[in-house]
């Protein structure tokens, strides 16, 4: 039994676990070795890094109550700045000395069961030392669970309470325990972090952990030893990694790696004693930031005696930046900012007394103080403003910058509020606006850091709002609401509701723009309390009584609150029942734009909008530009987690044709954060009235009173309220409104007065002229602190890891302008004197801008800094020193400036990345290592092959101790340069201008780490530099001046001749025009440009110079490179030229518009045709000569000769022997010229192709039969085919796949099979149709049989071409003198040294306007020229081209715009051709071309791969309706097309007219299109018989009651400019009579015996050949067709036409929303067209028409109808109660004593009362029109009355 018990005891003991919670024995001391290091840099090896290493011995001894003492012995600090891992750490005695001073004393901490409690240290211990101790003790922190070996929990540590995972392994044999603890620093309940400058960046509602830029983790490995006395930690190692990926690239990251190692060395049996020094409790392990953050990690400066340091630094800045920015100016400015943060108010006051009388010192000091943002600097600035020490501009800049850069805390808020309410600020409205907006931003930043915003912070703005609404001050209301919007606090919600009509009845009188501001102020509040805000906004949106603009802004703000599906569905339901089309269009377009969003965090809203859109009508998607819309575009790059969004809100007003408000905003999101970058809004009210206001006294006309009296006869009619003119704009940056402006009526009138005021009385122009005459001189420098972004987290060592970005901008302008007038101006001069004077201006301008940005990552403490810095700077200088002479009378301008004496850097951009180390012990000494060292190893794929000898030699050289010296020999650098060639990039491009002695160069130097990882970060690392430099260039003669002269007008021709031959100036003035013309042609070299002669220039292929500098030099011959891509174009041109007609100068017929695809296909198949058929001998001779000529042209043109031969053979077979021979000679002599310039042959290619097409059909019928089965041509319409065709024509069908509409000409055999016919009649894609030019209709082809048809047609075309060529000169100078001449040249010893000459010819008064521009080199030896020509050839075609090179023949780009028909619709085609362009231009275009398909896809285009002409692009736009068009874009290898593209406005598209009915000349689209579009926008109202079409294009039928005038249309504004009344004329319903009251006239028109009689003011006018003009009223009346036309544009009637049956009225655009009557309001509200005079909507057209009838007094007029409320003649039951009902709107009834002979049913609303209720009141007393509508019923309205016993009232 005893044995059994002993065994059980042993078993239980063996199975029992030791207590594995670590701890220390209070009776012993423990000695540990500690080492911790941090390194910052990229994750790749052999790159520069910076870091620090701390090593020491730790002694831990026990105290009672689980307390222990920690003593840090022998601390050593080492720095690292070099290439990792090559370079070693270096000991820093200075930092060691500083750190040792705080570790000489003891620390105490609490420790129990593996958990660290409170930490105690001496009271004056620096925060840095306490945090380092926290990092050490953090290694002892453990949470052990005895029952689990793997578990997770949220654990407190130095970085906060974060997610930790434990894995425990036990080694019982050796009594060891191994614990692994990993901490996820991205998943923390309470993360220790501090950010500055990020208050306006808010997180996306997505998986934030996945999207973060910075990520971190820590791993701990523990070794524990178990013993009888407990478990002891013997070894701890930790490794922490923080990485930042600026571009969200997986491998493009910068890394901070920290390591810790703790090893137990010795355990002693001794006990610690309590320290004698008082200890302060510093809290737990949680890292604590110091009260004042360390200075910016850009430099370390001494903080003692900041006053002296600030003065010294300011002196250095001012003295070293007089003329230009010094290299260290940004660092010096940042130093002043840092010192100002340290200084107190007394220091700043002392400094101010020293520099207050020095303007330059003041400016730098005020800028630095504004950027400091501390409590002391804010006090200092408040004193300056209170004492009026600053002028207005300084106060404005200082207040704005200070408040927006202020550090918001509980100390700065009261001072900022005091500054805002100071008397100096309150006196000036602009200063008050800036101060209030700035203060509200301070409140926003402060409250974003706290859970509850204090009431005291909001009270100043709330008081402003209360005062504004109590006094009715609109300006204060606007300011208060914008400030509330900036703050974005829910506590302000009650104030906002006071401005909205949903909760305040008095708010209905508040202007609309104030209500809109109140709604936009809810946006930020909705981020904190979305449910409440959404409830108010949906009420506003659903309330149809509110103004549409207010409701639309409510919709916009709702979607900013990220509504759920239910709310979005509610919005769609509101829009579905909406009668206001502006609101419906806005809601629909907003939903549709959101439904297409690609942003991940918008997915829920996007999908909800997709669902809600299905509830709405698709017709809302086709609304025109008159309706409000939301335009939204966003993009997102998932690889980089970055996106951008742009939104434009277009809000239209019913009272204008154009938007009344436009709001545009740009947002960016990256790594789970979103920022509203910029938002701009513009609102316009009543501006059209101010602009269109005429000095016409409408109220003084007699018709004004008549119209006003007639209005009283209408039930409830009121004039439209006068719209208060207002122009407002605002600017938001990062979601905060920083400025806004309101321009009221008075200011608008003042501006308009200044604009329209005669120049002689314009004070502004006089002031400018006087200022120039008195000279302007000054210098201005303004530094601007753009802000800082700082993000700090603790590392496991206890050192802070900081990410930061700092940007500084400095602007400078030195101006000196002197002016002189000849003759001198008097004191009170008139502006007309300037037109007779010669002005000389001498100016010296030196503007410059410097922007410096630094991004850092690393350790930043007050004692040392070890970080990675990326520095970027951009500096621009634009010195301009010139003398100008302006002679307005002679239209001459001459500018002279100095040549390039020295190198001037216009733009310089630099970018560098370094590893930087600084410490407080060595101020001014900075260790820097480039992140990308010069000897960084290459990728293995870039390593060059080395021989064994060289390799061994290099290996031997590396064995020495100095094998990696920082200074290398020249040879080694050369080897390095060769070895690093692939990562170093260098490029220089210079544009030399020898004639002015200058060259403009662009240089780029780049060396990056992309060879390691191809990421944006690696491309950013290294050194980059780009410059644009103006440099002198060597010339034969020293240039003294550069002169630019511009001569306009009639003297331009003489000036050109004088420039070349100065002696001929006198004789030129008396020379005849022909001589001057001949001289100009000779000077410009026109003959050599345009002639097609036997001898042409042979381009020489010069060898290209190898080097990095590419010279594009004016005046020198460019390289004549013949690439493979250009040879195809040359061959096309050559083949077309070789087959030209007998006359070499014959021009291309204007109506021969052959598709270039057909041309290309013909050129391809001509060779096959020549191989399959026998050619004539003449064609062989022609092709042989053409081939030889092509071979001489260039080596790469050989491929074009075969095409030339084949084309020539098919062409020559169509001519007789004589023409064939001459054609051969012509092609032989000119093929060389044409192969290099397609322009020379383009004029004859089309006609020759036509000839070839017709003739080859006779010569190659056999080949056509053989190729008939290859045809793939599809046609629609009627097919007219011939019995045979040439193979060339056949090949056009099956290669180009052209599809024709209308009467399509089939070139194939007419015996097609049924399968082919099924394809023909099938549906075609839009890109398969062929564009048909309109001018073919002007000269149609004649279809005559046989050879006779060809002969007659060719002769007709030839004669037409001859006459057309005679009337269309190649050189415009043959009929016109130049309108402008410009000369640029250098001057040496008062002699001109050549240069450039620009000449412009223009013929704008012709039916076919044309402009020609010639740029020539004035150097005799140069033939370089540039020619440009733009012209309208006829009513349907406009062309333009640019040619340049030797005599304008080397390169060419041309474009063409043609109108015609496409797929049966009117269309326009734009064609762009580039036969030959320089290689650099081609490379840029090819780069841009890569983005075209993607952009087209995003725009909704479909694409199809196809082989199109390689050097041509064309776009066809076909109008399928007034609001839609089809678009086809054909590029060299792709076709993009889209059908039914919506147009923003309607275009005038008439019905399709058959081609046979088109008469020449067809409509001139180029001259009349703009005016036609504008005319189409104007509204028209028409009445014909019983059909009425309103201004809003609503059509309805209405039979007018007899003898009663209706208000057809009138001006309902307060001006009452006109009134048009209409009634039926007699018994005939189709005849009408009208009465017009306008100005001082009353005009009647009525039909009599089939003619229209005209009475003006009661006097009858003759009916034939009438033309009445009333100058006083701007009124015109004349005969038109069978009636009269009236025009009074100044009174609001563009045109009124009346012929007795039809009335048509057209009003101008500015009358939108101002009309009323049966024609409607002209407000685009089609659903609200039946608007009655009282403002309510009628239920049908009949009630609508009746409401606009004018009642007449009994027995005084022909109209016997009047309106009265009626009682329903039956009893109805409502809710079970018998009721009697009365109409809520009046119904037409015959007058008393009259009986109705005709009636019409109308639907009327009724208000019901109980049947037993007494009703003794009259209709007027009851006011039924103000009662609610209980039911609807139909009653009869009287339309015709018989009055035998009419009662006439006295």
Curated annotation (Swiss-Prot):
After incorporation from serum via a specific receptor, it is cleaved into four fragments, heavy and light chain lipovitellins, phosphovitin and YGP40, and YGP40 is released into the yolk plasma before or during compartmentation of lipovitellin-phosvitin complex into the yolk granule. SUPFAM superfamilies: Lipovitellin-phosvitin complex, beta-sheet shell regions (SSF56968), Lipovitellin-phosvitin complex, superhelical domain (SSF48431). Precursor of the major egg-yolk proteins that are sources of nutrients during early development of oviparous organisms. PANTHER family: VITELLOGENIN 1-RELATED, VITELLOGENIN-RELATED. Residues 1122-1143, 1167-1266, 1278-1291 have a biased composition (Low complexity). Residues 1267-1277 have a biased composition (Basic residues). One of its GO terms (biological process) is response to estradiol. GO terms for molecular function: lipid transporter activity; nutrient reservoir activity. Residues 935-984, 1115-1313, 1338-1362 are annotated as: Disordered. It comes from the Eukaryota. Glycans are attached at residues 604, 1094, 1177, 1188, 1280, 1417, 1597, 1665. Keywords: Disulfide bond, Glycoprotein, Phosphoprotein, Signal, Storage protein. The lineage of its organism: Eukaryota, Metazoa, Chordata, Craniata, Vertebrata. Vitellogenin II is the most abundant of the three vitellogenins (I, II, and III). Induction: By steroids (estrogen). Residues 1-15 form the signal peptide. Disulfide bonds join 1581-1719, 1604-1755. Phosvitin, an egg yolk storage protein, is one of the most highly phosphorylated (10%) proteins in nature. Cathepsin D is responsible for intraoocytic processing of vitellogenin. Residues 1579-1756 form the VWFD domain. Residues 24-662 form the Vitellogenin domain. Residues 1156-1165, 1338-1350 have a biased composition (Basic and acidic residues). Transmembrane segments: none annotated. This is Vitellogenin-2.
């Amino acid at each position: 039994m005893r044995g059994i018990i002993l065994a059980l005891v042993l078993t239980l003991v063996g199975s029992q676990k030791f207590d594995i919670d670590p701890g220390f024995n209070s009776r012993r001391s423990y000695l540990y070795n500690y080492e911790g290091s941090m390194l910052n840099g990229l994750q790749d090896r052999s790159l520069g890094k910076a870091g620090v290493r701390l090593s020491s011995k730790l002694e831990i001894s026990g105290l009672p109550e689980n307390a222990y003492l920690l003593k840090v012995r022998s601390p050593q600090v080492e720095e690292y700045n070099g290439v990792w891992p090559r370079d070693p750490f270096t000991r820093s005695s200075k930092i060691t000395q500083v750190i040792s001073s705080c570790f000489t004393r003891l620390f105490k901490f609490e420790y129990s069961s593996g958990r660290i409690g409170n930490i105690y240290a001496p009271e004056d211990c620096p925060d840095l030392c306490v945090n380092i101790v926290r990092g050490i003790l953090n290694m002892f922190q453990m949470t052990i669970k005895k029952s689990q070996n793997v578990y997770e929990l949220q654990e407190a540590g130095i970085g906060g309470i974060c997610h930790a995972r434990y894995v425990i392994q036990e080694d019982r044999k050796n009594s060891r325990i191994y614990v692994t603890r990993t901490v996820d620093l991205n998943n923390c309940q309470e993360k220790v972090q501090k950010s500055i400058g990020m208050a306006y960046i808010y997180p996306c509602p997505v998986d934030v952990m996945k999207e973060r830029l910075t990520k971190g983790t820590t791993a701990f490995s523990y070794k524990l030893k178990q013993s009888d006395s407990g478990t002891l930690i013997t070894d701890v190692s930790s490794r922490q990694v923080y990485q930042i990926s600026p571009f969200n690239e997986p491998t493009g990251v910068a890394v901070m790696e920290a390591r810790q190692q703790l090893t137990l060395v010795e355990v002693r049996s001794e006990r610690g004693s309590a320290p004698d020094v008082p200890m302060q409790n510093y809290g737990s392990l949680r890292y604590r930031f110091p009260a004042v953050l360390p200075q910016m990690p850009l430099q370390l400066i001494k903080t003692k005696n900041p006053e002296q340091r600030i003065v010294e630094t300011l002196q250095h800045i001012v003295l070293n930046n007089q003329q230009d920015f010094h290299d260290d100016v940004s660092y010096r400015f940042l130093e002043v900012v840092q010192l100002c943060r340290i200084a107190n108010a007394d220091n700043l006051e002392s400094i101010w007394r020293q520099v207050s009388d020095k303007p330059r010192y003041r400016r730098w000091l005020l800028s630095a103080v504004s950027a400091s943002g501390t409590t002391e600097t804010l006090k200092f600035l408040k004193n300056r403003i209170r004492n009026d020490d600053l002028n207005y501009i300084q106060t404005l800049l200082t207040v704005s910058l200070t408040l927006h850069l202020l550090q918001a805390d509980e100390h700065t808020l009261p001072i900022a509020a005091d500054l805002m309410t100071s008397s100096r600020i309150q006196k000036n409205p602009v200063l008050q606006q800036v101060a209030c907006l700035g203060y509200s931003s301070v409140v926003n930043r402060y409250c974003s850091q706290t859970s509850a915003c204090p009431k005291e912070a909001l009270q100043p703005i709330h008081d402003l709002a209360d005062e504004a609404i109590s006094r009715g001050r609109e300006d204060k209301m606007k300011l208060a609401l914008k400030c509330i919007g900036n703050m974005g606090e829910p506590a302000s919600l009650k104030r906002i509701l006071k401005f909205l009509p949903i909760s305040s009845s008095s708010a209905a009188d508040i202007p609309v723009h104030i209500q809109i501001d109140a709604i936009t102020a809810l946006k930020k509040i909705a981020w904190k309390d979305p449910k409440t805000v959404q409830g108010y906004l949906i009420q506003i949106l659903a309330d149809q009584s509110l103004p549409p603009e207010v409701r639309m802004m409510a919709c916009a703000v709702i979607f900013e609150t990220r509504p759920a599906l239910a709310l979005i569905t509610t919005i769609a339901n509101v829009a579905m029942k909406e009668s206001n089309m502006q609101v419906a269009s806005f809601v629909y377009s907003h939903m549709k734009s959101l439904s297409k969003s690609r942003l991940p965090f918008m997915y829920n809203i996007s999908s909800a909008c997709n669902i809600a859109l299905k509830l709405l009508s698709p017709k809302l998607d086709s609304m025109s530009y008159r309706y409000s819309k939301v335009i939204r575009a966003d993009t997102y790059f998932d690889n980089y987690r970055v996106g951008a969004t742009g939104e434009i809100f277009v809000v239209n007003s019913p009272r204008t044709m154009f938007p009344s408000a436009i709001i545009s905003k740009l947002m960016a999101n990256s790594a789970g954060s979103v920022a509203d970058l910029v938002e701009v809004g513009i609102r316009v009210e009543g501006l059209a009235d101010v602009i269109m206001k005429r000095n016409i006294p409408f109220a003084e006309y007699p018709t004004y009173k008549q119209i006003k009296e007639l209005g009283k006869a209408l039930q409830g009619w009121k004039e439209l309220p006068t719209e208060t003119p207002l122009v407002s704009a605002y600017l938001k940056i990062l979601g905060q409104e920083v400025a806004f402006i309101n321009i009221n009526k008075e200011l608008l009138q003042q501006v308009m007065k200044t604009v329209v005021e005669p120049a002689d009385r314009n004070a502004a122009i006089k002031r400018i002229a006087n200022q120039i005459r008195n000279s302007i001189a000054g210098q201005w420098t303004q530094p601007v602190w753009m802000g800082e972004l700082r993000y700090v987290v603790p590392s496991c060592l206890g050192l802070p890891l900081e990410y930061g970005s700092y940007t500084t901008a400095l602007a400078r302008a030195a101006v000196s302008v002197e002016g002189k007038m000849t003759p001198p101006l008097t004191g009170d001069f008139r502006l007309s004197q300037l037109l007779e004077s010669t002005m000389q201006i001498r100016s010296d301008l030196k503007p410059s801008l410097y922007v410096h940005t630094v991004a850092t990552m690393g350790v930043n403490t007050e004692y040392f800094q070890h970080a990675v810095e990326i520095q970027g700077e951009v500096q621009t200088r634009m010195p301009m020193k010139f003398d100008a002479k302006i002679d307005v009378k002679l239209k001459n301008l001459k500018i002279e400036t100095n040549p390039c004496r020295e190198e001037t850097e216009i733009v310089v951009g630099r970018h560098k990345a370094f590893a930087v180390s600084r410490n407080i012990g060595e101020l001014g000494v900075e260790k820097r290592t480039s992140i990308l060292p010069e000897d960084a190893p290459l990728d293995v794929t870039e390593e060059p092959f080395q021989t064994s000898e060289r390799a061994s030699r290099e290996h031997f050289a590396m064995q020495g101790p100095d094998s990696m010296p920082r200074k290398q020999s020249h040879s080694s650098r050369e080897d390095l340069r060769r070895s690093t060639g692939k990562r170093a990039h260098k490029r220089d491009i210079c544009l030399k201008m020898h004639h002015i002695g200058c060259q403009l160069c662009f240089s780029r130097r780049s060396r990056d780490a992309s060879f390691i990882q191809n990421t944006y970060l690696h491309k950013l690392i290294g050194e980059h530099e780009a410059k644009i430099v103006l440099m002198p260039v060597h010339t034969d003669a020293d240039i003294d001046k550069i002169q630019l002269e511009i001569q306009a007008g009639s003297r331009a021709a003489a000036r050109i001749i004088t420039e070349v031959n100065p002696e001929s100036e006198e004789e030129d003035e008396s020379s005849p025009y022909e001589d001057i013309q001949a001289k100009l042609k000779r000077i410009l070299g026109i003959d050599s440009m345009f002639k097609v002669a036997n001898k042409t220039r042979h381009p020489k292929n010069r060898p290209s110079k190898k080097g990095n500098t590419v010279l594009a030099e004016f005046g020198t011959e460019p390289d004549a490179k013949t690439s493979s891509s250009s040879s195809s174009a040359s061959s096309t041109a050559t083949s077309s030229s070789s087959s030209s007609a007998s006359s070499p100068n014959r021009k291309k017929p204007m109506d021969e518009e052959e598709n270039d695809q057909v041309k290309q296909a013909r050129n391809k198949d001509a060779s096959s045709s020549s191989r399959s058929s026998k050619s004539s001998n003449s064609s062989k001779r022609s092709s042989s000569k053409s081939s030889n000529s092509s071979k001489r042209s260039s080596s790469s043109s050989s491929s074009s000769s075969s095409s030339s031969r084949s084309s020539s053979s098919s062409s020559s077979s169509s001519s007789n022997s004589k023409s064939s021979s001459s054609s051969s000679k012509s092609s032989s002599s000119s093929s060389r010229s044409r192969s290099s310039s397609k322009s020379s042959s383009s004029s004859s290619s089309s006609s020759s192709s036509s000839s070839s097409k017709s003739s080859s059909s006779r010569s190659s019928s056999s080949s056509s039969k053989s190729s008939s089965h290859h045809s793939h041509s599809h046609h629609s319409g009627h097919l007219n085919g011939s019995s045979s065709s040439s193979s060339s024509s056949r090949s056009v069908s099956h290669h180009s796949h052209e599809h024709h509409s209308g009467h399509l000409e089939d070139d194939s055999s007419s015996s097609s099979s049924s399968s082919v016919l099924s394809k023909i009649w099938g549906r075609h894609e839009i890109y398969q149709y062929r564009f048909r030019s309109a001018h073919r209709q002007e000269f149609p082809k004649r279809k005559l049989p046989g050879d006779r048809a060809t002969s007659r047609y060719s002769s007709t075309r030839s004669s037409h071409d001859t006459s057309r060529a005679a009337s269309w000169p190649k050189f415009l100078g043959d009929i016109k003198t130049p309108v402008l001449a410009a000369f640029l040249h250098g001057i040496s010893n008062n002699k001109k040294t050549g240069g450039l000459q620009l000449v412009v010819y223009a013929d704008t008064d012709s039916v076919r306007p044309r402009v020609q521009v010639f740029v020539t080199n004035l150097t005799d030896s140069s033939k370089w020229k540039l020619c440009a020509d733009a012209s309208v050839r006829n009513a349907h075609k406009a062309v333009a081209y640019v040619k340049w090179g030797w005599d304008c023949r080397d390169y060419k780009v041309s474009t063409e715009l043609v109108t015609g028909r496409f797929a049966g619709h009117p269309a326009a085609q734009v064609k762009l051709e580039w036969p030959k362009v320089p290689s650099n231009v081609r490379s840029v275009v090819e780069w841009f071309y890569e983005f075209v398909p993607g952009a087209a896809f995003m725009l909704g285009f479909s694409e199809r791969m196809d082989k199109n002409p390689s050097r041509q692009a064309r776009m066809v736009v076909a109008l399928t309706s007034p609001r839609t068009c089809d678009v086809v874009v054909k590029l060299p290898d792709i076709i993009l097309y889209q059908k039914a593209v919506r147009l923003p406005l309607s275009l005038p598209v008439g019905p399709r007219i058959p081609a046979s009915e088109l008469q020449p000349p067809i409509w001139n689209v180029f001259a009349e299109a703009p005016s036609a579009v504008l005319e189409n926008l104007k509204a028209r109202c028409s009445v014909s018989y019983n059909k009425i079409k309103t201004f809003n294009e609503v059509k309805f039928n209405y039979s007018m009651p007899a003898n009663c005038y209706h208000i057809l249309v009138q001006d309902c504004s307060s001006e009452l400019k006109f009134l048009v009344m209409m009634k039926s004329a007699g018994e005939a319903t189709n005849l009408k009579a009208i009465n017009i009251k306008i100005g001082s006239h009353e005009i009647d028109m009525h039909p009599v015996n089939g003619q229209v009689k005209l009475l003006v003011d009661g006097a009858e006018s003759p009916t034939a050949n009438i033309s009445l003009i009333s100058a006083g009223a701007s009124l015109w009346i004349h005969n038109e067709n069978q009636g009269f036309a009236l025009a009074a544009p100044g009174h609001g009637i563009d045109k009124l036409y009346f012929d007795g049956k039809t009335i048509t009225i057209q009003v101008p655009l500015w009358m939108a929303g101002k009309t009323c009557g049966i024609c409607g309001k002209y407000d685009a509200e089609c659903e609200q067209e039946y608007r009655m005079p009282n403002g309510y909507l009628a239920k049908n057209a009949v009630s609508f028409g009746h409401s606009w009838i004018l009642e007449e007094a009994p027995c005084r007029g022909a109209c016997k109808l009047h309106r009265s409320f009626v009682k329903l003649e039956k009893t109805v039951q409502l809710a079970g109660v018998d009721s009697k009902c009365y109409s809520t709107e009046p119904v037409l009834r015959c007058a008393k004593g009259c009986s109705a002979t005709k009636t019409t049913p109308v639907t009327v609303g009724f208000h019901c009362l109980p049947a037993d209720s007494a009703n003794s009141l009259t209709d007027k007393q009851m006011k039924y029109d103000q009662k609610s509508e209980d039911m609807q019923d139909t009653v009869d309205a009287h339309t015709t009355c018989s009055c035998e016993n009419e009662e006439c009232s006295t």
